[in-house]
Amino acid sequence: MNLLAAGIAAGLAAVGGAIAVAIIVKATLEGVTRQPELRGSLQTLMFIGVPLAEAVPIIAIVVSFILLFT
């Protein structure tokens, strides 16, 4: 049962992280398309937002490993 729960948690975390990164990149590209002069600031915000969006799946995978090995 723990193996199944850990696998589901890791899989959902990976899918959630991929969706979050896709939304962030999509919004950045739309912003750059509308206002090319803001490219630098939008790119900076994207480079801050992507790791924050990836932090939650990484934590979920760590929790699933803890659940798996205890």
Curated annotation (Swiss-Prot):
It is found in: Cell membrane. It is a multi-pass membrane protein. Its main location: membrane. The keyword Transmembrane applies. Gene3D superfamilies: F1F0 ATP synthase subunit C (1.20.20.10). Keywords: ATP synthesis, Cell membrane, CF(0), Hydrogen ion transport, Ion transport, Lipid-binding, Membrane, Transmembrane, Transmembrane helix, Transport. InterPro entries: ATP_synth_csu_bac/chlpt, ATP_synth_F0_csu, ATP_synth_F0_csu_DDCD_BS, ATP_synth_F0_csu_sf, ATPase_proteolipid_c-like_dom, F/V-ATP_Csub_sf. CDD domains: ATP-synt_Fo_c_ATPE (cd18185). The chain crosses the membrane at residues 5-25, 47-67. One of its GO terms (cellular component) is proton-transporting ATP synthase complex. The record marks 54 as: Reversibly protonated during proton transport. GO terms for molecular function: lipid binding; proton-transporting ATP synthase activity, rotational mechanism. HAMAP family: ATP_synth_c_bact. F(1)F(0) ATP synthase produces ATP from ADP in the presence of a proton or sodium gradient. F-type ATPases consist of two structural domains, F(1) containing the extramembraneous catalytic core and F(0) containing the membrane proton channel, linked together by a central stalk and a peripheral stalk. During catalysis, ATP synthesis in the catalytic domain of F(1) is coupled via a rotary mechanism of the central stalk subunits to proton translocation. Belongs to the ATPase C chain family. F-type ATPases have 2 components, F(1) - the catalytic core - and F(0) - the membrane proton channel. F(1) has five subunits: alpha(3), beta(3), gamma(1), delta(1), epsilon(1). F(0) has three main subunits: a(1), b(2) and c(10-14). The alpha and beta chains form an alternating ring which encloses part of the gamma chain. F(1) is attached to F(0) by a central stalk formed by the gamma and epsilon chains, while a peripheral stalk is formed by the delta and b chains. This is ATP synthase subunit c. It comes from Halalkalibacterium halodurans (strain ATCC BAA-125 / DSM 18197 / FERM 7344 / JCM 9153 / C-125). The gene is atpE.
